[in-house]
């Protein structure tokens, strides 16, 4: 049936269709070839970004920022910090030696080695005295004016006789308390009152001016009490002198210690009685 229809229509199925060929104009062909080449070139550099040209506004901002910094630098002027150059030790030593030579200290050192001049006024006028000479002059003046502060043992020494304690049963006899009070330039009553307060006991003075104390005490204990008494009521705290006097004012009944060597005065605390235990039989209820 199909073959009959094809024969009637005049169509041969064995034959193929002929494709129509386009007529190419040479000018159009060249343009097309050039377009393909340009397109391929653009495709190669499509991944890369083109550099943008900096706008003039950016440069203007940079100039505006530079202007205030330049103004600040001009305002500071000479205050700009500069790095200090480190001077070498050799140059500093040479400069120091030159200054010594100008001052004439070399001659002074030579004179001090040979012998010290006798007059103090001439020494004071010179420049650059050595330390050893100044120190010796200071101690010489100190020994002449105040030998006690110089630590010189050749001056007047303060010595008191050691306390002599005797035993009499349960009592202790302080036999030389009168001599110690005279050495300290204090009244025996004041010294006895201090002893009773420190030892916490009581006693009395017999006909031979000996102190009879209730209780058993050794001479070492008496020495410690006497040391504390000397520091508190005899020695001057300003010049460490023992040439003092204890006075009592009638208006306020306070004790004042007056130093006869330096003239200083200070108040002294009054003697307070120590603790005394009451020993005795209790009453029966």
UniProtKB/Swiss-Prot annotation:
InterPro entries: IF2/IF5, Transl_init_fac_IF2/IF5_dom, Transl_init_fac_IF2/IF5_N, Transl_init_fac_IF2/IF5_Zn-bd
Superkingdom classification of source: Eukaryota
GO biological process: formation of translation preinitiation complex; translational initiation
Localisation per UniProt entry: Cytoplasm, Cytosol
GO molecular function: mRNA binding; translation initiation factor activity; translation initiation factor binding; zinc ion binding
Family from the record: Belongs to the eIF-2-beta/eIF-5 family.
Record protein name field: Eukaryotic translation initiation factor 2 subunit beta
Organism ancestry: Eukaryota, Fungi, Dikarya, Ascomycota, Saccharomycotina
Gene name tied to this protein: SUI3
């Amino acid at each position: 049936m199909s073959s009959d229809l094809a024969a009637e229509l005049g169509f041969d199925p064995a034959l193929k269709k002929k494709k129509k060929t386009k007529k190419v104009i040479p000018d159009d062909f060249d343009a097309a070839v050039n377009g393909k080449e340009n397109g391929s070139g653009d495709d190669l550099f499509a991944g890369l970004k083109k550099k943008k040209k900096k706008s003039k506004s950016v440069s203007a901002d940079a100039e505006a920022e530079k202007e205030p910094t330049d103004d600040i630098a001009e305002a500071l002027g000479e205050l700009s910090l500069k790095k200090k150059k480190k001077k070498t030790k050799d140059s500093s030593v040479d400069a120091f030696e030159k200054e010594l030579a100008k001052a004439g200290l070399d001659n002074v050192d030579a004179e001090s080695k040979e012998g010290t001049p006798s007059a103090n006024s001439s020494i004071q006028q010179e420049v650059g005295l050595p330390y050893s000479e100044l120190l010796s002059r200071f101690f010489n003046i100190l020994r002449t004016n105040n030998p006690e502060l110089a630590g010189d043992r050749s001056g007047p020494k303060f010595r008191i006789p050691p306390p002599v304690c005797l035993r009499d049963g349960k009592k202790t006899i302080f036999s030389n308390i009168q001599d110690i009070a005279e050495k300290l330039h204090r009244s025996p009553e004041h010294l006895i009152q201090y002893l009773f307060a420190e030892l916490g006991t009581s006693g009395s003075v017999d006909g031979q001016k000996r102190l009879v104390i209730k209780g058993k005490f050794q001479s070492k204990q008496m020495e410690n009490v006497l040391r504390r008494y000397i520091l508190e009521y005899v020695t001057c705290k300003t010049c460490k002198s023992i040439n003092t006097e204890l006075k009592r004012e009638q208006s306020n009944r306070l004790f004042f210690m007056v130093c006869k060597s330096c003239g200083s005065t200070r108040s002294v605390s009054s003697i307070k009685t120590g603790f005394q235990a009451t020993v005795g039989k209790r009453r029966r209820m």
